[in-house]
């Protein structure tokens, strides 16, 4: 199943006779505080729920540690990635945690002592979404998701990246949305971008008042360029994280930023909309925190 949710298949028609009520509003998960009433620490189990992302960014001033392994505390089991929050490190934490747990639908467990597990700090990264000037609609889904969960970000073009030789000074994470499918076969399309003899503006004018609201330029011609590739490579080597989606993954694989990784095309498999069962092979990666051994993925 998607969203890391356990579901049960019921094949008996009796289920149709059970009393039901129409869901007319957004379903909100219940949340609250349990455990020690005067705790020294709060623990929030991490289950890869996006609401915890929203909580973290909305409370960026709270000092939070993340468990690097699963553990047990006071007869409760917690996944790797679970938040550990020390009361003394945060002012008025008890009231804030109580309100946040109710708003974001999680349970905070109060405990007396710090769990015996390795941790690292949970920071709020400085995020940028990089777009080309040839295809901007697909990465709009990324912007929508970040907007919904209150994650601030800069919206930058491949030209901005090409002209900035110190991306690490501004960002911790750069997301590159899906480009056109043709890019998988020819990643140089990202490098060259649009071509033409005359400037191609994308900006508001008397005749195009609705253009350029998210980003604008005097000239869309040209792409990331080799300079941009070098800037991204330096960004990653300096500790930045560069995440690509779908077809744009041809960029790091083609230019050696993801050595040992190749894109495998499946011309006989084309099943958009399908949900497939996958297995997680690296449970120690922070990317897989909160998930079980299997995961449903959307094609």
Regions found by a protein language model. Name each.
Residues 1-299:
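Intrinsic-disorder/low-complexity accessory segments
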């Amino acid at each position: 199943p998607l969203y890391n949710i356990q579901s049960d298949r019921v094949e008996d028609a009796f289920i149709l006779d059970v009393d039901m009520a129409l869901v007319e509003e957004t379903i909100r998960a219940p949340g609250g505080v349990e455990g020690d009433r005067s705790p020294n620490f709060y623990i929030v189990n991490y289950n890869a729920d996006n609401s915890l992302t929203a909580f973290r960014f909305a409370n960026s001033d709270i000092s939070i540690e993340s468990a690097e392994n699963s553990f047990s505390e006071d007869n409760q089991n917690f996944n790797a990635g679970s938040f550990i929050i020390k009361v003394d490190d945060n002012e008025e934490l008890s009231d804030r945690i109580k309100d946040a747990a109710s708003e974001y639908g999680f349970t905070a467990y109060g405990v007396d002592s710090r769990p015996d597990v390795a941790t690292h700090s949970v920071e709020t990264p400085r995020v940028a979404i990089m777009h080309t000037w040839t295809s901007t609609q697909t990465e709009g889904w990324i912007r929508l998701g970040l907007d919904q969960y209150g994650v601030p970000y800069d919206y930058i073009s491949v030209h901005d990246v090409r002209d900035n030789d110190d991306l690490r000074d501004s960002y911790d994470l750069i997301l590159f949305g899906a480009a056109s499918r043709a890019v998988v076969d020819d990643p140089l399309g990202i490098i060259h971008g649009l071509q033409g003899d005359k400037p191609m503006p994308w900006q508001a004018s008397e005749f195009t008042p609705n253009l350029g609201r998210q980003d604008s330029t005097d000239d869309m011609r040209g792409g990331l360029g080799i300079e941009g590739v070098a800037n991204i490579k330096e960004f990653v080597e300096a500790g930045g994280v560069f995440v690509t989606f779908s077809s744009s993954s041809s960029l790091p694989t083609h230019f050696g930023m993801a050595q040992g990784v190749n894109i495998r095309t499946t011309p006989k498999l084309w099943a958009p909309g399908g949900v497939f069962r996958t297995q997680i092979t690296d449970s120690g990666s922070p990317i897989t925190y909160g998930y079980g051994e299997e995961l449903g993925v959307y094609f």
